C-alpha cells in the first residue's frame, strides 16, 4: 500500500474532454486500484455531479470544488482548496492508490502546482483547429502527457492530424502525446499504461 496516493492532474481548455477522460479513467482503473476524484468548477459542482450520475465511482469518492474565480489560481498559485480536498479524501479512504484532480476549464498557460499533482495530463481537442499544438504554453509543452482528443472531428473541422502530430513533436521534444477519441475509447489504453508506468502504480 502506498503511504501517499499518486495524484494525477488533468487540465485543458473548456470543452476539450477532461471530464469524459476522467470518467473513462475511473471506469478503467477502479477495479484495480483504490481511486478518488477532485473536480474544479468556478461556481458549480457540475463536473462532480456528471461523474456521480454516470457512476464513475461511489459518490463519497468524488469531491467537487467550487473555485469561485480563475480556475488556474486554484491549481497553481493557491492550491489550498484542492489540497484540502485531497487531504479529506485521504482521511476518508486511508488506502487510496490514486487521486485524479480535474481542473476547471483553463487556458494554455495553466499548470498544476507540484504540491498538488505528481503527473499532469493536458487535454486539447481537434475542433479547436490543427494550429493549437504550435501555440505552445506550459500545458502543451511541459505536461507529462499531451492528449489530443476528439480526433473523429478532424474531417468535420478541416483539421490535419498529421500537422498536429508534427507540431506536437516539435513543441514537446521527447515528451509523449497521444491521439484519443473518448467516444470509442481510442487512446485510453495508452493513457492508462502511461499513468501506471510513470506513476509506478502497483509497485510495492
From Swiss-Prot:
This chain belongs to which protein, by name?
Answer: Urease accessory protein UreG
What Pfam families does UniProt report for this protein, alphabetically?
Answer: cobW
- Provide the organism lineage as a comma list: Bacteria, Pseudomonadati, Pseudomonadota, Gammaproteobacteria, Pseudomonadales
Keywords associated with the record: Chaperone, Cytoplasm, GTP-binding, Nickel insertion, Nucleotide-binding
* Top-level lineage group: Bacteria
What is this protein's function?
Answer: Facilitates the functional incorporation of the urease nickel metallocenter. This process requires GTP hydrolysis, probably effectuated by UreG.
Q: Please list the GO terms describing molecular function.
A: GTP binding; GTPase activity; nickel cation binding
Any one annotated GO CC term: cytoplasm
Binding locations of GTP: 12-19
Query: Does the record carry Chaperone as a key word?
Result: yes
Principal location listed in the UniProt entry? cytoplasm
- Mind telling me which SUPFAM superfamilies this protein's record contains? P-loop containing nucleoside triphosphate hydrolases
The species is Azotobacter vinelandii (strain DJ / ATCC BAA-1303)
